[in-house]
Amino acid sequence: MLTKRIIPCLDIKNGRVVKGTNFVELRDAGDPVELSKIYNEQGADELVFLDIGASHEKRDIIEHLVEKTADQVFIPLTVGGGIRTTDDFRRILRAGADKISVNTAAIHNPDLIKQSSELYGAQCVVVAIDSKRHYVNEEDLDSKQLEDKNVVKVDKNKYCWFEVFIYGGRKETGIDAIEWAKTAEELGAGEILLTSMDADGTKDGYDIELTKSISTHIKLPVIASGGCGAPQHIHQVFEYGKADAALMASILHYREYTVGELKKYCMDKNIPMRL
């Protein structure tokens, strides 16, 4: 059985790590280089570095910070935010990234996934999907407007489909997240980074229904993101959400747990982890 991965996430704004709730109300969480060093020493399996304002502000990613961060870590580093072209891929890989995460640009130009995969290998291409629940009334389930949507029953009498958002969660697309994940797989993506905007920063647990819906429709590894507030949430997203990796921020940035403590909890629940 493949080992599951614990991945700290560094959301960067103005050169600092920040954390918010539902993609807003950001507050400072520390220095990215220092935090990267700490998580590397604690035994994180990978790191994700996201320049969260780059796409919305239509600017390039902060390259020097990528270089400084890459100098401190000896585990795979995924970098995203403001990646628009295959040249951006090359530049950030040269700066020290092992994988590149694309989100907004891939929606506007899906061929970017294919071209980057062919140039640098599928293992370098991570497609990030920011998704939000779009609730549907039971009497509307047969509506023509839902013909291209994967409607999921998420509670006793609750139904929804999962909508893709871009520009750091600022703009809705009308695109179904399950269909977009399947398209990304067909185009040559190597991994999906799946964030629940509803759960983000709440610390109430991952969106299990969202994660499971994506994981069971594709063969690619799925990294679950958004909502981690306790070790049991990680166990749940592995066990019931069928995620391959769990991304987290607040729980680590504010020293509530170490990576090692989270891994031990999962191993005690018979989840295979790398020590």
UniProtKB/Swiss-Prot annotation:
Major subcellular site: cytoplasm
Annotated metabolic or biological route of this protein: Amino-acid biosynthesis; L-histidine biosynthesis; L-histidine from 5-phospho-alpha-D-ribose 1-diphosphate: step 5/9
Active site residues according to the UniProt entry: D11, D130
A GO term for molecular function: lyase activity
Top-level EC class: lyase
Keyword line: Amino-acid biosynthesis, Cytoplasm, Histidine biosynthesis, Lyase
Gene3D superfamilies for the chain: Aldolase class I
Subcellular location: Cytoplasm
Keyword Amino-acid biosynthesis: yes
Entry keyword annotation includes Plastid: no
Database matches in InterPro entries: Aldolase_TIM, His_biosynth, HisF, IGPS_HisA/HisF, RibuloseP-bd_barrel
Documented EC number(s): 4.3.2.10
Listed GO CC annotations: cytoplasm
Membrane-spanning ranges: none
Annotated NCBIfam families: hisF
Family: Belongs to the HisA/HisF family.
HAMAP family: HisF (MF_01013)
Subunit annotation: Heterodimer of HisH and HisF.
Protein name: Imidazole glycerol phosphate synthase subunit HisF
Species for this entry: Methanococcus aeolicus (strain ATCC BAA-1280 / DSM 17508 / OCM 812 / Nankai-3)
Lineage: Archaea, Methanobacteriati, Methanobacteriota, Methanomada group, Methanococci
Gene expressing this chain: hisF
